[in-house]
Amino acid sequence: MKNNFFKKTIILLIFLSIFILYSNADEETITTPPGYYGLKRIKRFPHSNIESNNISQTDADLYYPDICAGALPNAEGDLMTFYTFLDANLTLNKFLITKESIYSFMVHSLVILPGGSVTIKRGLLFFSLEEYNSLNIINPAKFPLDPMGYFPGILALGGSLTLIGNYPLIYSAQVLSKTTLRISPPFSSIPGDNINKLYQIKIFSDSNPLGSLCSIIMDSTRTIVNISGCPPIGNEKVMKVAFIKFTIDEMNTGISNRYSVKKIDESIGASIFITGDTKVHIENFFINGDGRTLNEEYNDHKLIFSPNNKNIVTDIIKGSNQRYRNSLYIEFSNNAVIKNCVIFEKDPRRSPIVFFASNVEFTSNIISSYSGSNLIAQFGTENIRSKNNHYFLVPYSRSLNTSAKSMDYGYEGGNGLYSLSPNIKSENDTFIGQLNIFNFNFISNRSSVTSFDRDCYAPCYNDSDSVLSSVQRPVDFYLINPKYFKISNITLFNSTIFNLFVANSNGNQPNTYTINGLVAIGPIVANLDSNFLILKDFIATENFKLDGSVKRLDIINSSIELPLTSKDIIKNVSSLSTNIQNSYLYYPSNDSVEQLKDQIYGSVITPYYYSSPITLDRIKIVSIYPNSPLQVISGLTFNIVIQFRLIYAFQDIIICIFTSDNDSIQNRTVDFNVLSNKCILPVSVGPNKEGSANVRVQIKNSLSSDYLYIIDFPQITVLKTYTFYSGWSMANPDLANQQFIVNGSLFQSGCQTKTDSNCTISENSNYVPNLPNVTSSDELNSLFSSGVTSLNSNEPVIITTAINSNSTISQIQLFFTHVPIDQHASLLSVYIDNQPVYVLEPLQSNQGPTFKNITFKYENTNSLEKINIAFTTRGDIYLTSMAIYSSNIFFIPPIIPDPTAIPDVPANENTLNLLTIVLPICSAVVVASSVMLGRLFYKKKFKKFKSADIENEMTTIEPIETSNSNIENKSESIATPQQRNEQKEIPNKIHPVLKSLVKPKIAPYTLISPLPPLETKTPEALNPHFNEIGCDPINENPEINSDEQIVLPVDTPQISPDSPQHSIPSSSPPPPPLPLPPSTSLKPLKLPIVDSFRTSSFMFRLERSNLIELSDPNNPLRFSSKILDFNLKGLKATLFKEYSNFLLISNISSSTIFVKVILPRDSRTGNVGYNVHEYF
């Protein structure tokens, strides 16, 4: 009977094995117990420079059955059991066996060895040899079994596999009635009237994510389809249909396990296993494989080798749940394309698709499964581009414990894309039924998981770069426009849990994770305790919220389109630092917006609150200033500026209402200037003011009570000035007596590991000499020539240093040199007594080594004599030196000029005031480097100069400079030797005893940006002077960053954040300037300076100089030339030849002007020459 059954059904069974005719020298033959195929052992990972570490449970070697050696001969009669193809290339296109009908091409195993090439344009059905053996009806010999469990299925070990169907499978559908659909594009692939007889459609929707198989009647247009034999169509929110053959035969374009020999309608598991850098192209195929990897804990087959011979297997233990036996599994493939396919898995499984260390293009597919995940990227080096796919999922969960060594991931039950990889890109994908759309898991020291100590990110070739498995590069998530729909069938899905994005870090080193361009349609969970999360170009819509734990959170260039304040956004996120910049937050005008004042100093939370969605269409914010925490010296002036564009023509005046919580900055209403598109608030800080101010501006229609925008500026701190106390250089610790004198201030070398030193350093420090120059000053380069970093990446280097116990407030200044080791940013964190000052600040330079200066305040309320300073980096940022400033050491008052030396002046003027103007002068010989001009006038006349200067809106340098002081008083924080001798309160010896440390109140200050590289021979690069805090030594007007639409001073570094649990003190000391080269020997001027100007932004700054153009109507002088080039016209000067030039200066005012010309140093005497001209 059984024999008659097979004769009637005329089933053709063909065993395929494709291999090339040369042997592989790397293969080893393994002997197995009777009843099994022998095995071949090959290197699993084709990269020649990456070797196994032999510590992982994941095999670095791959074993596959030697089926060609054990193939049985064909039996006589109607049934062919096996064919072994010896050709290197094979195309399976059409199989027609004519007896009673046309039947399918059935396969047990298809093997492609390296070099082989297989193209299949028709469908394949798989059957089980174990079931066939149990029948034992035709051939008495039993077929050997696969000891590794690859079959039934396809095993590709190299070469290429091409599965391409002849017509598209997937169509969009519009519901016309409960039984009628309109499909697009028209189904025109099959001619004639056989469509209704030969085809069915499978409808995938949010009510039936596993699909309904329906019979069809199609009209003549091939667009209208009437369905029957399936549930009626409901109110579907999303629907896709796939055309499949009514019976699986040779015309079907698919791979299926639909038939088995034992029972015609019983499914068996089949899988496609791709490895060995096989080139894969699968298009227009229906993959109904029901892979064999369950959503349970892995339990692999195990080979028991002989203790005396590694090439003999004595026993095989079959596992109950082998990994990597999914419907489609691709590993170590540099070129894999899956397009317009339907991948269906109806039984509970781990995932229908797993990509492992491969480069995959995954486009326009339908994935429907009852599984833990739709797709898993499970090695960590995958590069996957998912676009326009529909992921249907009925979550199937198991409570398992993640095991890193077994790489047992993706079973959680409800993941769309589950990944261990940083390079997963999703664009316009649609998800139906998931609990977590994107679930990323980053594990530390992946070598214990992958079997390899080094990684090579796909695509990976023999000559590709490899990196240590313990290194996690910065991660950029590109998750563009995802769409999500819940399952409407309550019997299939009854969970209220839904997360758009989940990221976990399992002990990784500090790293940066950036989510780019995401439209947030649901919650985001970030469990990245030691990491930096950036939301960039981010749009938050309905159901958005943010949960988890990060070390630093930045929201940049984003829009929150639901009523949330900054506090609402971050209330469920634990973070040390939060920054919200150039981002729009919707908040109704009838509700009050709470200003966040309890954040750390380094947090920049400056959202643009808008009252109504229509506001975005009427006003566009361009920039604000300040856009980072600003420090100003008391007694100075500066401007607060907001720039915006009016898109809508308002009938009434637009006003800006500035308010402050500190009387240092007065409340004021300012009209919007339609010419400059700005509201400018001039601020003049009193001479005795000190403290921090939080400033807010409301943009309003003058006749309306509702606001249009509310914007909070970064904190503005008014400072007083302290002076230099002590300095240390991280020079050779063996030269403890080595000293550096910079601008008269003494830096002592030799931080020791000894405990009795005034400067001790932890033993994990790595001393590095001969660091590259990062400034144009020889003295500073000498100070910065050596540095320390950690021996182990991101392990803190701790320095214990003495501090003035008699000073309540001190300042600490740290100088770092960054020498990049690759193109990726390095993260710098700084702590004082275990409290964060600077958190994960990214430093990156594409132009070589750069300089970083950090200054922060320390409140020594317990009169400590020593403090601990710690910093962490990945090993390419070096601390070169540090300085401490004390609040109870004051500047020496400037020398009062002798009034008898002042020349005679007209009777109506009893004071001679000096106005300084600087001109750029070009020459290759010693020439005049600046011209200083003075003029006489009454204070009331001088006011017009001050008001004109205030209108220079974005000037941040000049506001920090004082008036009515002598030019010799540079307000520097590093004292001269004379000043140090006169400062009697500095102790001669600092007590070495370390008292119990307390948690201080701290506030960091961002100082200057990295200096230009030395090879850049611009006037800026040749300037040896550093600017003060928040100042730009070259450009006076801040530059608008077009990418972020934020006004930034040119080259200003980003703000570094700090711990949120520490309040900011009400007062702060000044940020001391960097040490400068020794000052010139200029004699004190005998006239007080009223104000000073320079006439070019390319000219280096003289003290307290403002920028004024030569053509400015407020400029009382006219010059015959702007540049003195001594007629050289760019040529080099001849040695020992004298050159001359002249400058004609005309006074067009009624006041008397005093002119002083300052010349560069004399090369012989070392003195600075100057020449005094008469009044004119």
Swiss-Prot record:
Biological-process GO terms, alphabetical: regulation of developmental process
Signal peptide: 1-25
Keywords: Membrane, Signal, Transmembrane, Transmembrane helix
Extracellular side: 26-913
Biased composition (Low complexity): 965-974, 1053-1066
Cellular compartments annotated: Membrane
Topological domains, Cytoplasmic: 935-1176
Stretches for region Disordered: 965-985, 1050-1080
InterPro entries: GDT_regulator (IPR052015), STKINASEGDT (IPR026237)
Transmembrane region(s): 914-934
Biased composition (Pro residues): 1067-1078
Gene Ontology CC entries for this record: membrane
Keyword Transmembrane helix: yes
Membrane topology (UniProt): Single-pass type I membrane protein
Highest rank taxon of the organism: Eukaryota
Family: Belongs to the GDT family.
Protein name: Growth-differentiation transition protein 5
Gene: gdt5
